[in-house]
Amino acid sequence: MDVQRSSYIFIALSIIAMFLITGVKPEVRDICPGVCHAGIEPDCDTLCISMGFTGGYCQGLTCCCNPKSSKSSIINRPI
């Protein structure tokens, strides 16, 4: 009986591990990190700039950040 129970536990844990590795992840909202409202500090633009984005905008009551620039500000020229 213990061997059968152990195999069921192993199968159940394997299925759970499979879902954790491949499966459902919560939506990461790092592009929209805050809330827009008149009394909230810091404002959306300041929040996004402090996180390394180029700026921010309000989408309803959600503060969303502009995409980060793909160009580097420092360009190394070949010798």
Swiss-Prot record:
Keywords, alphabetical: Antimicrobial, Disulfide bond, Fungicide, Plant defense, Secreted, Signal
Alphabetical GO biological process terms: defense response to fungus; killing of cells of another organism
Organism annotation: Arabidopsis thaliana
Subcellular location: Secreted
Membership in a protein family: Belongs to the DEFL family.
Signal sequence segment: 1-26
Disulfide bonds: 32-65, 36-58, 44-63, 48-64
Primary location: secreted
Protein name: Putative defensin-like protein 80
Domain of life, per lineage: Eukaryota
Membrane as UniProt keyword: no
Any one of the GO CC terms: extracellular region
Keyword Signal attributed: yes
